[in-house]
């Protein structure tokens, strides 16, 4: 608790007929009363220090929770001390208790001291008003920091001369620690003062006890009142939140037995500090047992064992024979001799190792060398480590002092050698210590660079140099450069100068990938099979092999692991490391635009791999904290040189590694320097060829290394073929592995013309979904390119020879011909592909094909292809080539219909031909039968049936229906919650859908735009001029007798005559590029797949049920059948409110993609969010239970349906049998749900909510959010589908959500509705997901996208939709609306910058059932509905005041005539609500206030700037209210409270300087002269806090009461006259809101300001008749 001034009502003691002398003497005969006014100066003069001593200790603990008998056993201690002190420059500290009190308390035999109250008085020993200040702090120095130590603090102005403060800490302290409680005092302004300047008195009251209680309840109230009545200001303690410690790690090892142990160092480092002196730093601390000299039973022999056997023996002799000095001197001499012998051995080892050549410095690439200077270090002598002064120890000190562990010096030195740390590790150790010291990374790094010189830290300790030389035979000792050399090259260490990079053949031969061939080494390279790409140890000539291998692995891994919402680029970025990562980072940092262009082509892993291949290991290291390591790597990079041609490969690998570490991978200077560092015979030639081939140094070192490796390979090949050049000049060929015979390269090509006879030659690529066998030996453990038995099947081995890709053979049952491939030679393919013709470029291409130029994959709309030769380019490359792309004109609806009709005509003509042929064949058959059967006189006519309409029927078109043979299905067609169940005929021969007019309502039928002529099978003609309206939905009855997915029926014509049939024709069957397959027992619908039974199946099912069998579909459903959610075609305006005029194809495509992924729709299971709710339980031991609720049959039916849906969507699950909780679920049917015909389940989580910690996350303020969009002109509104269900639940919280219903006990997997903390948790989820989008307003699950113009809105929607895809949430399709000029949001309607109440709220208020007002719930519902209109009706709170009184306990429910007049008046006011406006951000704000006994009123006025004239002022809002009970306030109190209320109402507009106008002159003068600071009344203090809390500077301005026109009316009963003044002809009464601030806009011509007093009579003349007329009406 922070010590702050008491903010309650101050009280002062006044005397009645009593002198001050009597009060000072403590007489009780005076009459004392509490009044409100306080005279501070008088109180200071009457202040008496003894008032502190007058506080009774027993009164403080009078009402303790313990019994009085036990209370007597407690010791209550009161301490008082007073002293004069001098505090000028330094701080003064004193203990809270006098020393004699602390001593007496300790002798009481108690353990704890509870501090009940502390009071301190400070009085200046000088004259008043000298401009000084005093700060007092009550603290506990048991803590190390002031923030935790502070119990309370206060500063006071000594102008008054004195001050008294008190605090009730209410905590206990251990008796021995009472001296830690202190009072600290500092002063300002006493710098030139001499002598005692302050007198301090301290009073404490506490209680001694032997046991600590769980809670002390002390009687503070009476004491506080006593102190407050004497003018003492309260001091409150400080509260510190422990949230910064949440989630910290607890070290359990601290529980181990570390008794009598201490941390002692084992290493010391002496170095030169910044001041030129020497400093000592210890490190390598270890836990060591220490001897406690107070223990009498300690075993001295056990302590002596720590010194080792040798020392133990000598110490034993020391106690018996020698003096301490002699014995210690002998020990030191022995140690010195052993040390010198060890150093001699190690120096010999150094000389031997210095002859060896260096392969490379074993530096840590992740650390840095700094350029600051370091002092010269010599070997540390034992004497310099403080091992002197043994002779100063006496016998007693040796016996009682703890002796640390001693070891043989040889063992110590050997352990140091084994524990040797490299230079980089030393830097890390020092940097870690600096980081702990400063607590800031940048500050620690700065101190590291300032203090230490990395060139010299290697020689800091000679023991480390010895260890380094002994562990690496190839490293030579370093030498310090000469001080006088200043050139960069000369200033380097010897091992950093340019030198020849050599390889130790003995060490190299240990690598399993090398084998010795003659005098050279041949590399048998096997690429790593890891999905993480690391080329640090890969020779450059095998980079391609490794990259190709990695490409196949990482692509398969991505396809296997990818999920919706995963970012491919982030995932692939985690699959590279080492120098690859460094170079990739470096390239991106310098080519950000190119990188973004690659990302824009689509999320394909091939693009990322291609980027790594082309740019050769690129990325961006922007971490500036690695500058020291970069400098070290840069110096090593410049030191590299190669003179031996056979060592070019390892030299380039090292050069590339150092360049990537130094971030010089794309530095032109270092790329060119790579060629210069090569052997002269090679470097000049390859450099010239590199430039000649058109390469640039800007391509990077990776490209240069690859070019050099390729160039050397070509030279070696040429040398091998020609065999004429001397091998001396091409000595590097010994390190290059070449292929003896060059073979033609082969590639895979998709099979376009399948030939059954060549099936054995077809292959396919490996698939992660199927088992793959080797193409050669059929082994599942490897593929053909790595087959160890490659030549067992030489025919197949020769077929794949030269093929770089992995392949597998075609299985015998594999019929996926589209994925069959054939192997062809590359030359043949190029010759075939390079046929010359005139290309015709169009938008679009194959998705699995790359660009012919850049080899990147692109999306369909970003691809250009030639339809003749199928050559395909990306949009970027086509723009660079300036190709002329033919825009394919999208056919109109009429053209599409004409084309369809033409196609149908051709089909019908073909069918007619077939039918004629069948008729002819039938006639021939009849003639044949007639000739054979002559004995029959009559020929039986073959009955024929027709399924088409006949023209010769007048009333009805007869059809012969055989349901056992035709494809008839049960369907449901619906529109606007009205549906019909009809038996339909699936007829693929019918061109259109045709329905009988008697089967559907007449309201579903529209006239066609033109008459359609239809021909039947018998060529009869029919004219169709009616069709069904759009948006008719069609559902099929499924096997389980439920109707499935809704399909769009499409264009359906109404038959001209009744047929009693519904024919589903070709138009529906081929709708949405799908198809319908008709089987005997069922039909299958492709794309939107479903299986629906026909009438034949129903007969079979009925037969099967009678004989105990199963329906055929339940036992005969194809294995491949799976219900796929229907993909609705995107129709912009009806579905999402999208304007056809926008025409932004990319936005439409994006919406279609989101619909396809399910992110726009009504299926909550499509969400891919990973957000997990973290609800905190207060008491985990509580069981949540409930009583059983009876359910009606209707409730059970609802439960059965909705619970099944929740289970199918996996939102809930069956509860665990061991679950301890259950919450009741019940059905709610209110008006809105009855209209929608969907009752909902409600869960009573009240007990669970009571047992949960409240989530502190704030829900946004509605008014503040509305103000953010006042400039927007175009909106899009979205709503998340079942918003809370997007959040997952932690496993340990799921059981708490278990609920019971008629169907059983179930547990939620996602966050259910009804959890109290769910809105806050969901708002946090929305802020984390979309909070950075400044144009998106988020209010729980409502999202509003607001933009200034249409173009900006399109870009905002694209960004928003991409974020939706990343987050994986589902937007409700029904509630999504885009490109709106006006929108309803948060209860208001926004249009053209104006805000009005939503129309449906107005309708609800006007149409509210008046019969419900006589009931308490009905009246409460009506008043709650009126809260939405508070911001739009003046004085509404005053108007509805009588109605609120009816809701009380004693309120009368029955409405009388006046009550009904209030209701009717409210309805009239609601009908007059007009749109409102808000002040602009640049406007200057003025608040005008006035007050009366009836209430207060305020007006918000705005103008363009502070200095604009009054004619520019406009009223932007107003507020009013009452003061509740009538209080005995003065007029000044009312005016002050009116300003406070106005500041609170208009707080959101007060973010800058403003002006307050009031007709109270006392307030204006008091503020300007700061006289208000001397007042202690609560309202003045509250006014001061309101004025200063936000840091703005208000200006007070006084106006005369007759000019304070509108605020004056707002604060009185006659405030309704304002509206009468605006509308003199009106006879209605008006009122102004009493609780809410209401934005309002009035034109400048109607400004309320009155310039002169002369105009007042004019207004009075208008007002008086109106008042009289209104009074008569009300009477």
Curated annotation (Swiss-Prot):
GO terms for biological process: proteolysis; symbiont entry into host cell; transport of virus in host, cell to cell; viral penetration into host nucleus. Capsid protein self assembles to form a bacilliform capsid about 130 nm in length. The capsid encapsulates the genomic dsDNA. Following virus entry into host cell, provides nuclear import of the viral genome. Virus particles do not enter the nucleus, but are targeted to the nuclear membrane through the interaction with host importins. The active site is at 987 (for protease activity). It comes from Rice tungro bacilliform virus (isolate Philippines) (RTBV). Its EC number is 3.4.23.-, 2.7.7.49, 3.1.26.4. PROSITE patterns: ASP_PROTEASE, PEPTIDASE_A3B, RT_POL. Residues 476-485 have a biased composition (Basic and acidic residues). It catalyses: Endonucleolytic cleavage to 5'-phosphomonoester; DNA(n) + a 2'-deoxyribonucleoside 5'-triphosphate = DNA(n+1) + diphosphate. Residues 792-964, 1086-1138, 1620-1675 form a propeptide. This is Polyprotein P3. Residues 7-21 have a biased composition (Polar residues). Polyprotein P3 is proteolytically cleaved into several chains by viral protease. A motif (Bipartite nuclear localization signal 2) lies at residues 744-760. Keywords: Aspartyl protease, Capsid protein, Endonuclease, Host nucleus, Host-virus interaction, Hydrolase, Metal-binding, Nuclease, Nucleotidyltransferase, Protease, RNA-directed DNA polymerase, Transferase, Transport, Viral movement protein, Viral penetration into host nucleus, Virion, Virus entry into host cell, Zinc, Zinc-finger. Pfam families: Caulimovir_coat_dom, MP, Peptidase_A3B, RT_RNaseH, RVT_1. GO terms for cellular component: host cell; host cell nucleus; viral capsid. Residues 1-29, 468-491 are annotated as: Disordered. Coiled coil: none annotated. GO terms for molecular function: aspartic-type endopeptidase activity; nucleic acid binding; RNA-directed DNA polymerase activity; RNA-DNA hybrid ribonuclease activity; zinc ion binding. Residues 970-1077 form the Peptidase A3B domain.
């Amino acid at each position: 608790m922070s010590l702050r001034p008491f903010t309650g009502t101050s009280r002062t003691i006044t005397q009645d007929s009593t002198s001050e002398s009597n009060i000072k003497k403590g007489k009780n005969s005076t009459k004392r009363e509490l009044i409100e006014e306080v005279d501070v100066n008088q109180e200071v003069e009457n202040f008496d220090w003894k008032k502190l001593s007058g506080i009774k200790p027993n009164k403080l603990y009078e009402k303790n929770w313990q019994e009085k008998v036990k209370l007597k056993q407690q010791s209550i201690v009161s301490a008082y001390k007073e002293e004069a002190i001098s505090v000028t420059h330094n701080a003064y500290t004193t203990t809270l208790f006098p020393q004699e009190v602390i001593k007496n308390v300790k002798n009481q035999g108690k353990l704890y001291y509870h501090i009940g109250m502390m009071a301190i008085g400070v009085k200046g020993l000088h004259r008043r008003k000298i401009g000084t200040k005093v700060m007092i702090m009550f603290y506990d120095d048991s803590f190390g920091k002031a923030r935790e130590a502070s119990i309370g603090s206060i500063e006071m102005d000594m102008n008054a001369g004195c001050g008294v403060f008190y605090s009730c800490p209410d905590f206990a302290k251990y008796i021995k620690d009472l001296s830690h409680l202190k009072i600290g005092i500092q002063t300002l302004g006493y710098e030139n003062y001499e002598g005692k300047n302050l007198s301090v008195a301290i009073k404490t009251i506490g209680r001694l006890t032997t046991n600590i209680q769980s809670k002390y309840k002390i009687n503070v109230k009476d004491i506080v009142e006593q102190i407050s009545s004497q003018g003492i200001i309260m001091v409150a303690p400080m509260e510190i939140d422990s949230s910064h410690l949440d989630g910290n790690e607890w070290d359990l090892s601290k529980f181990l037995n570390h008794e009598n142990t201490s941390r002692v160092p084992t290493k010391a480092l002496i170095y030169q500090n910044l001041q030129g002196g020497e400093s000592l730093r210890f490190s390598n601390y270890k836990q060591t047992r220490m001897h406690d000299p107070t223990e009498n039973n300690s075993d001295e022999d056990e302590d002596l064992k720590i010194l080792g056997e040798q020392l133990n023996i000598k110490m034993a002799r020391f106690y018996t024979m020698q003096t301490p000095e002699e014995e210690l001197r002998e020990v030191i001499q022995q140690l010195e001799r052993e040390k010198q012998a060890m150093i001699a051995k190690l120096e010999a080892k150094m000389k031997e190792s210095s002859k060896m050549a260096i392969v490379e410095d074993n530096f840590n690439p992740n650390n840095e060398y700094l350029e600051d200077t370091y002092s010269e270090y010599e070997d540390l002598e034992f004497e310099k480590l403080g091992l002197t002064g043994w002779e100063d120890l006496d016998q007693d000190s040796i016996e009682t002092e703890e002796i640390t562990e001693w070891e043989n010096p040889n063992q110590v030195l050997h352990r140091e050698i084994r524990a040797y740390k490299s230079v980089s590790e030393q830097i890390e150790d020092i940097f870690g210590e600096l980081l702990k010291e400063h607590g800031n990374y940048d500050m620690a790094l700065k101190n590291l660079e300032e203090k230490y010189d990395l060139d010299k830290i290697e020689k800091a300790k000679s023991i480390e140099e010895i260890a380094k030389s002994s562990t690496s035979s190839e490293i030579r000792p370093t030498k310090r450069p000469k001080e006088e050399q200043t050139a960069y090259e000369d200033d380097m260490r010897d091992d950093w100068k340019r030198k020849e990079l050599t390889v130790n053949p003995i060490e190299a031969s240990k690598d399993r990938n090398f084998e010795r061939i003659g005098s050279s080494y041949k590399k048998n390279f096997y690429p790593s099979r890891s999905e993480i790409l690391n080329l640090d140890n890969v020779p450059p000539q095998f980079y391609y092999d490794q990259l190709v291998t990695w490409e196949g692995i990482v692509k398969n891994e991505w396809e296997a692991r990818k999920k919706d919402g995963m970012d491919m680029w982030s995932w692939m970025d985690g699959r590279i490391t080492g120098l690859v990562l460094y170079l990739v980072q470096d390239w991106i940092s310098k080519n950000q635009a190119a990188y973004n262009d690659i990302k824009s082509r689509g999320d394909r892993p091939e693009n990322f791999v291609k980027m790594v291949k082309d740019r050769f290991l690129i990325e961006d290291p922007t971490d500036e904290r690695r500058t020291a390591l970069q400098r070290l790597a840069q110096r090593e990079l410049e030191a590299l040189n190669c003179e031996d041609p056979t060592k070019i490969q390892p030299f380039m690998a090292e050069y590339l590694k150092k360049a990537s570490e130094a971030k010089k991978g794309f530095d032109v200077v270092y790329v060119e320097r790579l060629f210069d560092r090569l052997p002269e015979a090679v470097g000049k030639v390859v450099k010239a060829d590199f430039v000649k081939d058109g390469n640039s140094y800007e391509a990077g070192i990776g490209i240069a290394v690859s070019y050099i490796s390729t160039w050397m390979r070509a030279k070696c090949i040429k040398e091998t073929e020609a065999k004429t050049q001397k091998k001396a000049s091409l000595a590097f060929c010994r390190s290059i592995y070449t292929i003896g015979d060059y073979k033609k390269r082969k590639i895979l090509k998709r099979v376009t013309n399948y030939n059954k006879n060549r099936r054995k030659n077809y292959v396919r690529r490996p698939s992660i979904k199927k088992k793959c066998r080797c193409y050669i030996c059929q082994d599942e453990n490897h593929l053909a390119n790595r087959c160890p038995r490659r030549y067992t099947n030489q025919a197949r081995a020769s077929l794949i020879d030269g093929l770089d890709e992995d392949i597998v053979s075609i299985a015998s049952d594999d019929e996926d011909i589209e994925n069959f491939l054939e192997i062809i030679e590359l030359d043949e393919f190029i010759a075939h592909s390079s046929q010359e013709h005139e290309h015709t470029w169009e938008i679009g291409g194959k998705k699995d094909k790359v660009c012919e130029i850049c080899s990147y994959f692109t999306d369909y709309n970003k691809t250009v292809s030639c339809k003749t030769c199928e050559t395909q380019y990306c949009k970027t490359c086509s723009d660079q080539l300036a190709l002329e792309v033919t825009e394919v004109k999208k056919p109109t609806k009429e053209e599409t219909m004409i084309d369809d009709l033409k196609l149908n005509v051709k089909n019908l003509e073909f069918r007619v031909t077939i039918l004629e042929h069948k008729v002819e064949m039938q006639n021939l058959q009849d003639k044949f039968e007639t000739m054979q059967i002559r004995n029959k006189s009559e020929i039986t006519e073959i009955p024929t049936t027709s399924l088409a309409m006949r023209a010769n029927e007048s009333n009805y078109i007869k059809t012969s229906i055989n349901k056992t043979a035709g494809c008839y299905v049960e369907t449901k067609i619906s529109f606007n919650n009205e549906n019909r169940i009809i038996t339909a005929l699936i007829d693929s021969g019918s061109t259109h859908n045709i329905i009988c007019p008697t089967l559907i309502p007449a309201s579903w039928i529209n006239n066609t735009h033109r008459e359609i002529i239809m021909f039947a099978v018998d060529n009869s003609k029919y004219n169709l001029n009616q069709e069904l309206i759009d948006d008719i939905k069609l559902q099929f009855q499924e096997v389980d007798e439920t109707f499935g997915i809704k399909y769009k029926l499409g264009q359906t014509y109404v038959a001209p005559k009744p047929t009693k049939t519904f024919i589903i024709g070709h138009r529906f069957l081929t709708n949405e590029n799908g198809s319908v397959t008709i089987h005997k027992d069922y039909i299958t619908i492709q794309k939107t797949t479903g299986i629906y039974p026909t009438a034949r199946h129903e007969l079979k099912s009925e037969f099967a049920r009678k004989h105990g069998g199963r329906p055929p579909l339940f036992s005969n459903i194809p294995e491949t059948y799976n219900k796929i959610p229907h993909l609705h075609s995107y129709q912009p305006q009806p579905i999402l409110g999208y304007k056809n005029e926008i025409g932004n194809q990319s936005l439409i495509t994006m919406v279609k993609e989101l619909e396809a992924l399910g992110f726009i729709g009504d299926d909550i299971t499509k969400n891919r969010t990973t957000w997990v709710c973290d609800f905190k339980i207060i008491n985990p031991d509580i069981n949540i239970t409930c009583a059983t609720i009876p359910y009606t049959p209707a409730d059970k039916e609802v439960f059965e349906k909705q619970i099944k849906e929740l289970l199918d969507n996996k939102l809930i699950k069956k509860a665990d049998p061991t679950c301890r909780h259950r919450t009741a679920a019940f059905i709610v049917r209110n008006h809105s749900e009855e209209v929608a015909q969907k009752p909902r389940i409600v869960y009573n989580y009240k007990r669970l909510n009571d047992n949960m910690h409240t989530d502190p996350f704030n829900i946004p303020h509605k008014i503040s959010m509305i103000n953010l969009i006042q400039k927007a002109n175009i909106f899009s509104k979205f709503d998340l589908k079942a918003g809370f269900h997007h959040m997952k639940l932690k496993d340990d919280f799921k059981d708490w959500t278990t609920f019971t219903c008629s169907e059983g006990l179930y547990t939620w997997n996602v966050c259910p509705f009804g959890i109290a903390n769910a809105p806050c948790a969901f708002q946090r989820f929305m802020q984390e997901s979309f909070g950075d989008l400044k144009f998106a307003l988020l209010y729980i699950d409502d999202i509003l996208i607001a933009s200034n113009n249409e173009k900006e809105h399109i870009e905002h929607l694209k960004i928003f939709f991409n974020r939706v895809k990343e987050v994986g949430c589902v937007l409700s399709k029904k509630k999504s609306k885009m490109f709106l000029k006006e929108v309803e949001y948060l209860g208001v309607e926004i249009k053209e910058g104006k805000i009005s109440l939503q129309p449906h709220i107005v309708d609800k208020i006007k149409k509210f059932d008046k019969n419900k007002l006589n009931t308490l719930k009905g009246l409460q519902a009506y008043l709650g509905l009126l809260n939405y209109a508070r911001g739009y009706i003046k004085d509404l709170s005053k108007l509805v005041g009588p109605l609120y009184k009816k809701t009380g306990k004693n309120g009368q429910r029955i409405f009388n005539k006046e009550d009904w007049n209030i209701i009717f008046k409210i309805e009239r006011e609601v009908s007059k609500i007009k749109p409102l406006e808000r002040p602009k951000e640049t406007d200057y704000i003025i608040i005008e206030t006035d007050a009366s006994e009836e209430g207060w009123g305020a007006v918000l006025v705005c103008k363009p700037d502070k200095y604009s004239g009054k004619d520019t002022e406009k009223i932007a809002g107003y507020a009013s209210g009452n003061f509740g009970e009538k209080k005995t306030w003065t007029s000044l109190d009312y005016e002050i409270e009116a300003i406070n209320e106005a500041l609170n109402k208009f707080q959101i507009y007060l973010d800058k300087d403003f002006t307050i106008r009031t007709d109270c002159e006392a307030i204006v003068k008091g503020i300007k002269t700061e006289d208000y600071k001397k007042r202690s009344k609560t309202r003045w203090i509250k006014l001061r806090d309101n004025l200063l809390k936000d840091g703005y500077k208000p200006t007070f301005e006084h106006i005369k009461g007759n000019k304070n026109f509108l605020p004056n009316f707002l604060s009185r009963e006659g405030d309704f006259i304002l509206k009468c003044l605006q509308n003199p002809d009106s006879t209605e009464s008006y009122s102004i809101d009493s609780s809410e601030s209401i934005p309002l806009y009035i034109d400048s011509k109607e400004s309320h300001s009155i310039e002169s007093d002369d105009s007042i009579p004019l207004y009075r003349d208008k007002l008086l008749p109106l008042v009289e007329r209104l009074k008569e009406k009300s009477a």
